[in-house]
């Protein structure tokens, strides 16, 4: 993996082209001398803002972006449900006025009644007798019928608009919202009418939907060459599930503006008594679909999420997050007793990233926190510290090093008994070696008392009855080498204990044994209490748990 930085460097300006007071005295002279100066640059921010909406397509994109960022599901109860009820009762009001006001006067509103209008006859207008009744025919069409005629047209237009809205909402709710899922690991045939069986061979070829978008010649080629498949290719199949997934906003809108109520109001004579079944219909449909069915889906989602959480906490997390600790012990025949403990995956985690160049060549890069960039990693020689690894206390990430205790390590010439590890168990929290098995409790426990043997700040090891100790009790004495192959003990002055103190571990500077007496010499003072408190051994522990 590689990170790239884009550095924008402005070109250097030469002294000849750099502006100076001697060359240019007035900015207006610059604009006059520049033939490429555009007058449009004088426009301010308002003209730039209006330029974004210069075309109708820009308005279309802007409106669609504003609509797309709205969370419509959160507005299902506040917008969709009231809006659907308003449209339903608006159509009820329109049908009520049509059946009780417009319908009785429909003949006067739609048919012309001037077939026998004598006032339009030129022959009859010559007589004075007919002139006195000429204004009576025109006065019959008063303002009331004009208003009814306009209302009739308005109600007809509202009915058409509400019908189109109801049809579009119903179609989008029932047929427009589907999600397709591919099922590859299902052995039996799923019992659902929304599941179709498809061949895996079709995944490598053009789908029918893609062929429909192609040209006429492309569709002909698909029908001729890709229409039939061999039986062998149809054996490998998968299932495709087409799931119906309407949104919450559309569901609330469909329930409140139901096509059932719309058809009922359209096909019956509406009176004030019709309002009662409409209200009952709205409440029952809301109670079944919104209050019961959607709540059932939410409850099933909660149960599935709880099952996944239980599986994650009981199976996945214990398998993925196992308590581990890295350790490195001395596996050489010298038996120096060197043990290194690290946090988990300290030695296996690498900061080197392997990438490939455009030509396909392998490239290894390492992140350098000092320069905040990636550098090419050079292959270095691997060094194995076989002996005297305490010379390198910070060789691997500054890990904690447990020094070799003479009271716990055996002589290079001695080997432990085969019965020394029969009574001890393995610690459940940290790795250990056969030479460094701590004293165990009767049962494994992760409490503070059970792990006190691994924490020197709480309690150091005291009079232990470990079977390992009785075999290695003479580690303090230097036996003569009979085979002339043994290696003398290394002086403990070569240990660097400064790092031990900084890491919170107790240490000691001089623990060289006395060959004659088998005791240890301390350079910290002659005080008995001071000597006891600084001793790292279990026999002289001053732990409060003792």
From Swiss-Prot:
Region named Disordered: 1-35, 405-441, 505-546
Sorted UniProt keywords: Membrane, Nucleus, Transmembrane, Transmembrane helix
Entry keyword annotation includes Repressor: no
InterPro entries assigned: Nur1/Mug154 (IPR018819)
Biased composition annotated in UniProt, kind: Basic and acidic residues: 1-10, 25-35
Topological relation to the membrane, as annotated: Multi-pass membrane protein
Compartments it resides in: Nucleus membrane
Pfam family, one: DUF2418
Coiled-coil positions: none
GO BP term (any one): regulation of exit from mitosis
Gene Ontology cellular-component annotations: nuclear membrane
Composition bias, Low complexity: 533-546
Biased composition (Polar residues): 406-441
Transmembrane segments annotated in the record for this chain: 155-175, 249-269
Main location (coarse class): nucleus
Role this protein plays: Member of a perinuclear network that controls recombination at multiple loci to maintain genome stability. Required for rDNA repeat stability.
Family: Belongs to the NUR1 family.
Protein name: Nuclear rim protein 1
């Amino acid at each position: 993996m590689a990170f790239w930085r884009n550095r924008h460097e402005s070109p250097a300006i030469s002294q000849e082209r750099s502006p100076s007071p001697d060359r240019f005295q007035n900015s207006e002279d610059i604009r006059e001398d520049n033939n490429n100066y555009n007058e449009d640059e004088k426009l301010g921010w308002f003209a730039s803002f209006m330029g974004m909406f210069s075309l109708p397509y820009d308005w279309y994109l802007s409106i669609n972006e504003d609509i797309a960022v709205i969370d419509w599901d959160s507005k299902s109860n506040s917008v969709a449900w009231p809006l659907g009820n308003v449209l339903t009762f608006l159509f009820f009001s329109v049908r009520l006025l049509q059946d009780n006001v417009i319908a009785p006067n429909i003949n006067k509103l739609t048919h012309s009644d001037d077939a026998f209008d004598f006032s339009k006859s030129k022959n009859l207008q010559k007589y004075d007798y007919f002139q006195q009744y000429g204004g009576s025919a025109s006065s019959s069409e008063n303002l009331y019928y004009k208003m009814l005629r306009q209302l009739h047209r308005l109600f007809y237009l509202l009915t058409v608009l509400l019908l189109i809205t109801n049809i579009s909402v119903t179609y989008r709710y029932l047929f427009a919202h589907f999600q397709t899922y591919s099922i590859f690991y299902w052995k039996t045939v799923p019992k659902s009418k929304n599941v179709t069986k498809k061949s895996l061979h079709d995944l490598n070829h053009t789908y029918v939907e893609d062929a429909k978008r192609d040209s006429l010649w492309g569709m002909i080629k698909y029908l001729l060459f890709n229409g039939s498949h061999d039986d062998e290719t149809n054996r490998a199949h998968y299932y495709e599930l087409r799931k119906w997934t309407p949104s919450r906003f559309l569901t609330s809108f469909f329930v409140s503006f139901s096509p059932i109520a719309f058809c009922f109001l359209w096909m019956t004579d509406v009176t004030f008594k019709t309002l009662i079944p409409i209200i009952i219909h709205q409440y029952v449909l809301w109670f079944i679909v919104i209050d019961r069915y959607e709540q059932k889906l939410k409850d099933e989602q909660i149960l599935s999420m709880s099952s996944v959480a239980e599986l994650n906490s009981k199976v996945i997390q214990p398998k993925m997050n196992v308590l581990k600790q890295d350790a490195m012990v001395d596996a050489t025949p010298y038996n120096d007793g060197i043990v290194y403990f690290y946090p988990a995956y300290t030695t296996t985690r690498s900061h080197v990233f392997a990438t490939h160049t455009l030509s396909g060549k392998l490239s290894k890069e390492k992140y350098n926190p000092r320069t905040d960039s990636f550098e090419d990693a050079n292959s270095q020689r691997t060094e194995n510290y076989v002996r005297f690894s305490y010379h390198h206390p910070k060789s691997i990430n500054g890990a904690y090093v447990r020094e070799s205790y003479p009271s716990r390590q055996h002589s290079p010439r001695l080997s432990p008994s085969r019965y020394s590890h029969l009574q001890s168990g393995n610690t459940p929290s940290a790795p250990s070696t056969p030479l460094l098995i701590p004293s165990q409790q009767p049962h494994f426990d992760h409490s503070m008392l059970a792990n006190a043997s691994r924490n020197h700040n709480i309690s150091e090891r005291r009079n232990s009855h470990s079977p390992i100790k009785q075999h290695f009790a003479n580690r303090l004495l230097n036996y003569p080498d009979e085979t002339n192959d043994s290696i003398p003990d290394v002086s403990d002055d070569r240990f660097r204990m400064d790092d031990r103190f900084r890491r919170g571990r107790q240490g000691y500077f001089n623990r060289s044994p006395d060959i004659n007496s088998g005791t240890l010499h301390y350079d910290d003072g002659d005080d008995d209490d001071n000597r006891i408190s600084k001793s790292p051994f279990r026999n002289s522990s001053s732990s409060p748990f003792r």
